[in-house]
Amino acid sequence: KQLPHLSFLETAKEQSFMSKYEVADRYQLMWRFRTNSMFDIANYYSMHPVLLDEHFRSLPPIINFSNREFYGNRIRVMRQNNPNDKILEIVHVPDGKVDYDATRNLPEIEALVKRIHEIIVDNERENPDNPITIGIISPFRAQVEQLKISLSKVISDYMMEKHKIEIGTAHTFQGDERDIILISWAFANNSFPQSLTFLQKPNLFNVAVTRAKNKMINFVSKDFTDLPDGLFRSYLS
């Protein structure tokens, strides 16, 4: 349920390698690197696949949704949380909307940047020698780029590096983690319906919501009760 590999190998180049090394026609579909990774091939030929079912990264409230939706509750969560901690948080942005070309949700960005500033100020005051690591995710590239611009105006390069602040799509965080993850979903009442289809792609969604170790903060501009059935509505509810 993770993201597949990304290949920038041109189709023509790939075919030329097939011809050069005389790969038989019956094997070419399997050995096309544009569509199959070495992991895919190993998995195809595996007689007895093993599920790595122990999860050490996230606190239970963070991983429980993916465990249920994607892994059939087969994952054993090895961490325990303090029931008094607010681990999952939803920040509703009532004036959130996407701009004229439906690529950026500026009110969400403003709310998220403000929250990050508060997190850093609190951490620097209370425990400056143990900096919280922070990740910022959005499903949409334009939102990511605007987040980088807006955050750079408020947070210094020194603090960005100290708190290992990374901003990107789910692809950026594949295999990575942070103490706190903030997600700007960027979907609003005036968003194109196709945007919802995109952000609910299972692999992308699963990676996005499982990068946090200790806390997840979701910024949303649309009430979940107004969303159609699907991953996004189920997650927010």
Where are these regions (language model features)?
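Conserved helicase motor core of SF1/SF2 NTP-dependent helicases
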Residues: 1-237
